[in-house]
Amino acid sequence: MSTVNHYLGNPKLKKANIQIDFSQEEIQEVVRCSKDIVYFCETYQKIISIDEGLMPFAPYDYQKEIMHSVNENRFVICKMPRQTGKTTTMVAIMMHYALFNPDFNIAILANKAATAREILGRLQLAYENLPWFLQQGIVEWNKGSIILENGSKIFASSTSCLLYTSPSPRD
């Protein structure tokens, strides 16, 4: 692949508005991934493990259940303890939604901007490790947001920042 097709010289990212010739197998994979979030995650999602470094995401059954639940319901509440892979699962869900739902807006909100950016960084790492035929072209890619050529947008912000920037009522 020519460097002309890379987003800002990053060989792992596809630039927006370039023509890609898909094989029949790639088309079938895109369709299958768009319909089955668990298959997409198990087959193409990469995560960082403290012990093993970059590795395929192998979700546990409860994580698969969360994926299906979020996919099928507008509102989901998960009562879970710390360190159970909630963030990893949600990053996978966010990436699936952004890729396969045009004009989808995703806000990653946390109590601190650095935490929200760290979660966005996990999503960016996973995105960079997708095969090109699954990637949407990149319109914007930075520490605080991503815009894909299908119109999907992902941004990271602190909740405290939102409080300070919201308009205050005046008499």
Sequence positions of predicted segments:
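Phosphate/NTP-binding elements of NTP-utilizing enzymes
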Residues: 2-166, 170
